[in-house]
From Swiss-Prot:
Reactions that this protein is recorded to catalyse: a 1,2-diacyl-sn-glycero-3-phospho-L-serine + H(+) = a 1,2-diacyl-sn-glycero-3-phosphoethanolamine + CO2
Modification sites for Pyruvic acid (Ser): 256
Places the protein is found: Cell membrane
One GO molecular-function entry: phosphatidylserine decarboxylase activity
Name of the protein in its database record: Phosphatidylserine decarboxylase proenzyme
Length: 300
């Protein structure tokens, strides 16, 4: 059972996990771990899943999936019957009114829908993936020099579930550099998997870019793939001027994760998110939701 903090009600909701029973089998039993090693973590499994989700026949699963997980299809730009495949629905665009991005310069906004955790004054060689398990930023990036620049900074994990809106956005205006792609496995990013697989983020397929923001400095914007995520699609144009709230890209079917890493003294995350993280809970947020503030440039 996964409890998620709800900022509106100030209560804890129980997360509905798509394929929860299968996840537990794969990551907590000997038979499951064998299947994980031989097939599920590999690209071929994600490719086959992606092939089905791109097919016309997969559209028949959309209505049932949306109903089971209480997805508000009224937020979609397109009607449910207009989607030609499950992946089209999974990577759906929303009406502009469904996710509103505050244009205030000082506000840090969530880049996507998901479950958020945040840490301040980080040791880049001991980043948490879950309580009791750490990994190295230099290994994640495969760049020791770049990783050192973020020592003492702020680190955010935004975990997306299959039921979430899977497009992600720029949380500030600025320019985003070229994306670097790193090959890897396709482990789940569910807490069950994170608690069983050491250095999972460093093992999975991932992409990162340096987002040169107007108000938060140079931020590492990292996308981590997961089980069934055959593709991380970047839709932005590197080096071009970006407006706050503009789309950066999207994930195809599966769970996935976004990591944001800020340099020291650039951002202050909201107290409730920091407190919940310390208590071991994730906080549910939506794309465009305020999650912190930039630190006044005059104090730097």
């Amino acid at each position: 059972m996964i409890q998620i903090y709800n900022r509106k009600t100030k209560q804890y909701d129980i997360e509905q996990v798509a394929g929860g029973r299968l996840l537990n089998t794969l990551y907590t039993t000997g038979r499951g771990r064998l299947g994980l090693k031989l097939l599920v973590k590999r690209k071929i499994y994600s490719s086959l899943t992606g092939f089905f989700c791109d097919s016309k026949i997969s559209r028949k699963t959309i209505k049932g999936f949306a109903e089971k997980f209480s997805i508000d299809t009224n937020e979609c730009e397109s009607k449910v019957e207009e989607f030609k495949s499950f992946n089209e629905f999974f990577a759906r665009k929303l009406k502009p009114s469904a996710r509103v991005f505050d244009t205030s310069e000082e506000k840090l906004l969530s880049p996507g829908d998901g479950r958020l955790q945040a840490w301040e004054n980080i040791d880049t060689e001991k980043l948490l993936q879950i309580k009791g398990m750490t990994y190295s930023l230099s290994e994640l990036l495969q760049d020791e020099k770049l990783a050192r620049e973020y020592s003492g900074g702020t680190y955010l994990i935004l975990r997306l579930c299959p039921v979430d809106y899977h497009r992600f956005h720029f949380f500030d205006s600025g320019k985003c550099m070229e994306t670097r792609k790193i090959k890897g496995e396709y482990y789940s990013v569910n807490p069950v998997a994170l608690s069983k697989i050491p250095e999972l983020f460093c093992r999975n397929k991932r992409e990162y870019s340096i987002f040169k923001t107007d108000n938060f400095g140079d931020v590492l914007f990292i996308e981590v793939g997961a089980t069934s995520v055959g593709s991380i699609i970047q839709t932005y144009i590197p080096g071009e001027r970006i407006s706050k709230g503009a789309e950066k890209g999207f994930f195809k079917f599966g769970g996935s994760t976004i990591l944001l890493i800020f340099k020291k003294n650039m951002v202050k995350i909201d107290d409730d998110i920091i407190m919940q993280t310390k208590e071991g809970f994730e906080t549910k947020v939506l794309a465009g939701e305020a999650i912190g503030n930039c630190i006044d440039k005059r104090t730097k």
